[in-house]
Amino acid sequence: MPRGFLVKRTKRTGGLYRVRLAERVFPLLGPQGAPPFLEEAPSASLPGAERATPPTREEPGKGLTAEAAREQSGSPCRAAGVSPGTGGREGAEWRAGGREGPGPSPSPSPSPAKPAGAELRRAFLERCLSSPVSAESFPGGAAAVAAFSCSVAPAAAPTPGEQFLLPLRAPFPEPALQPDPAPLSAALQSLKRAAGGERRGKAPTDCASGPAAAGIKKPKAMRKLSFADEVTTSPVLGLKIKEEEPGAPSRGLGGSRTPLGEFICQLCKEQYADPFALAQHRCSRIVRVEYRCPECDKVFSCPANLASHRRWHKPRPAAANAATVSSADGKPPSSSSSSSRDSGAIASFLAEGKENSRIERTADQHPQARDSSGADQHPDSAPRQGLQVLTHPEPPLPQGPYTEGVLGRRVPVPGSTSGGRGSEIFVCPYCHKKFRRQAYLRKHLSTHEAGSARALAPGFGSERGAPLAFACPLCGAHFPTADIREKHRLWHAVREELLLPALAGAPPETSGPSGPSDGSAQQIFSCKHCPSTFFSSPGLTRHINKCHPSESRQVLLLQMPLRPGC
């Protein structure tokens, strides 16, 4: 634990003491010579008759006589200009008690009695200044009382020794000089100052002797919190708070009904009766900030997300230029406009990312070379290896699975406008499985042979200009591998009645690529390891995992008659 981590609180507050009036008046005398309490002096010195007699103003002459005697005898209060601090009778009694030692109280002094008004004023001041609160608040109160009593009722002159011991104080009427503070309070304050100085002096030495002497801790700079934009900044990403219009009145509940609770929107000042209504409230000052991509019209709520998204568009022009160069150096484009559109759809699918999958692509944008699968085919040969991009038909379009111009292009929806863009589906050219997104189709294409992907891409590696060696003997279609060709022959065997009218030029009788409209024929999934066929993709997957494990799989040419699946 670092040094100075636990600080012992040794500073104790001093006790509250009631300073005796005699100690304030005679600070130079020790405790042996301390006079008795002044409050007890009048009651102890006065005789019983004087204590019992109520103070009256019937003796004005005696007061004048005392003043005259005071002037004749030479009072030390006026001659020396000092205040003895007590009345004459109290001083005389104290002197008598100090000389004779402890014993019975001496006889009352023959000095005349004090006037009644002076006695009342002295008792009132003593009563007001005898409490500790008054003594602490007015440290010079006792001296003022003593000076006041001396000026009102002087007594006999003190001895020269006592006069020397008395402190030199200004008379009461002079307000310029202030009396000295109490000695006990001054001693306590000096002790506190000394302790504080020692503590401050030890602090740098402790810091220097510690292990972290090189880096003295600096006070942390407090972060200045700025609440200037508190009403214009929303904590939710993508939202912004509009500034309040100066003339817009605050809306509230209809009628004069008072809401049950204080559920008020802090922005538009609308009041609600319950917190649920306030939670469902859509404030008019909160607006959504949209950051739209200029290339694909995607909307983001943060500019950083938009900048990260736009990086996906950067490689696209390079891929398009490479495809254009490959089309210029490779085979010449076909004279048929339909074949150029088909190859353009395939190339755009491979070149563009998934962010732009739903954008309308024009037919003349980035013209590409024709698909290599149809390079050596006749115009009436089918099928063409490409990507089929369809819109959802309502009702479904009657078309065959291998007809000319269906695969690899978008078929418009009947009755829809040319500028309108509907939902699209993407059909696998091998198993005719439909997908709603390009990413799903890309993942599905990886399950087929690697040669099928090379057949889709006209500019893929060294096979860019090489002809496809595996041709179908029935329709003349060329395929990159024998497995895909045998799968194609399997489709010929299963749907021969559907393919023959399409190849002869007759209109197809099916309602879609999956089979006839009556539902008698379904899509068939064949195993590439054995002649088994299935009507669903999960069934084929289960068959492959069960019957053809990875260590014993062998590619078999499908030249045997079909048999039902296991």
UniProtKB/Swiss-Prot annotation:
A Gene Ontology cellular component where this protein is annotated is: transcription repressor complex
Task: Quote the gene name from the UniProt entry.
Answer: INSM2
User: Which residue ranges have biased composition labelled Low complexity?
Assistant: 318-348
Pfam families, from UniProt?
A: zf-C2H2
Role: May function as a growth suppressor or tumor suppressor in liver cells and in certain neurons.
Region entry SNAG domain, spans: 1-20
What are the protein's UniProt keywords? Cytoplasm, DNA-binding, Metal-binding, Nucleus, Repeat, Transcription, Transcription regulation, Zinc, Zinc-finger
Protein name listed in UniProt: Insulinoma-associated protein 2
